[in-house]
Amino acid sequence: MNPVATLFLAFAMSTDAFAAAIGKGATLNRPHWREAVRTGLIFGVIEALTPLVGWFLGKAAAQYVSAWDHWIAFSLLLVLGARMVFNSFNTKEVEETKPSAHSFWLLALTGFATSIDAMAVGAGLAFVDVNIYSTAAAIGLATMAMVTIGVMLGRVIGHVAGRRAELAGGIVLIGIGSTILAEHLNIFG
């Protein structure tokens, strides 16, 4: 995978966490930059680790599915991207109580919940020629940056940008999956 695709993947994977961070920022009276960075670090580390776990699980199965690996990567990215696009149009609001402070465990649980798709992407990347360590680092750094910004913007922009970010992330994932398939099938020459 080329560096531009890696960059797009990294930011696409961070959009769920960005949307969650906007919600977390909206629950704070006045988000302080230290809380934003702390939240970004927690989410970023988790988001960097989950594609590694998925990649190792995918590599374990690679010898059995190498003939159709590109279809697996495409399908996983298509399903995840479509789910993100669908969720961006879901207008059902969830009523939740506002915490007085964000505990480490609350942030870690939220970070893990938003990184499940990164684990699936990691599994899909096991079937593609990619440096998983640099890809995971890019995902973690992008997530850290997006979450830090999301917490700070949470009070101001609320849930509207969260939905748009998820829509954009879903479209990017579908595009990356389509590119992987097109490259393997040599569609572009």
From Swiss-Prot:
Keywords noted in UniProt: Cell inner membrane, Cell membrane, Ion transport, Manganese, Membrane, Transmembrane, Transmembrane helix, Transport
A GO cellular component entry from the record: plasma membrane
UniProt membrane topology term: Multi-pass membrane protein
InterPro entries assigned: Mntp/YtaF, Put_MntP
SS bond partners: none
Subcellular location field: Cell inner membrane
Chief site of localization: membrane
GO MF annotation, one: manganese ion transmembrane transporter activity
Function: Probably functions as a manganese efflux pump.
Protein name per UniProt: Putative manganese efflux pump MntP
